């Protein structure tokens, strides 16, 4: 397998695309986002992060036959059996806003505020005529806090305080948050893999 020179990021979320591009900068890849290529995201109907990431990656790969990277992320609250998890974005959308989602989640928690963020990255590419699929998982633990605090980041970042910190992800400077959040953990694993390609 030779190193590939191009990569499609199967996401329309510009915040996510910028984060991924920054991590992959040392590899000098020509990176395009799904929206730049006018491609539509498929419905994510998997029951796990792995399934959803693969659904996105496989759909875009089938259209372009180029290396594709996709991810699925979620916010899980332990005492709510991992909810909202794989439906994190849809739950917030159904609530009308992330702030309202935070309020509803807070009303459902009594004493156990432990929470976690998870990202799974799927990479699909062709090697000597064979389609190769790789998965890279990143997780960080912490606590749900309400009301949310901070202006940086997006999604559930304002209501998540990583273990060992007294700031939410949204209160942290971008350069700090981007180095250790759940997506960064998964991206470092991806980068380690890319370095092994001859």
Per-range role (PLM):
Residues 2-8, 15-198:
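Anionic-ligand binding patches
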């Amino acid at each position: 397998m030779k190193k590939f020179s191009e990569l499609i990021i199967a996401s329309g979320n510009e915040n996510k695309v910028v984060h991924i591009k920054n991590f992959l900068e040392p590899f000098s890849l020509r990176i395009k986002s799904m929206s730049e290529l006018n491609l539509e995201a498929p419905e994510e109907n998997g029951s796990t992060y792995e399934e959803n990431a693969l659904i996105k990656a496989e759909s875009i790969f089938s259209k372009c036959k180029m290396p594709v990277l996709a991810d699925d992320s979620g916010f899980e609250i332990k005492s709510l059996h991992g909810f909202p998890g794989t439906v994190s974005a849809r739950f917030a959308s159904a609530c009308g806003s992330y702030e309202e989602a935070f309020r509803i989640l807070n009303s459902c928690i009594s004493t156990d505020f432990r929470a976690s963020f998870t990202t799974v990255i799927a990479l699909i590419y062709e090697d000597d005529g064979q389609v190769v699929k790789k998965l890279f998982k990143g997780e960080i633990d912490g606590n749900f806090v309400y009301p949310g605090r901070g202006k940086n980041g997006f999604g559930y970042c304002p209501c998540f305080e990583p273990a060992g910190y007294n700031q939410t992800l949204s209160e942290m400077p971008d350069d700090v948050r981007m180095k250790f959040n759940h997506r960064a953990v998964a991206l470092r694993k991806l980068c380690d893999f890319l370095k092994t390609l001859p």
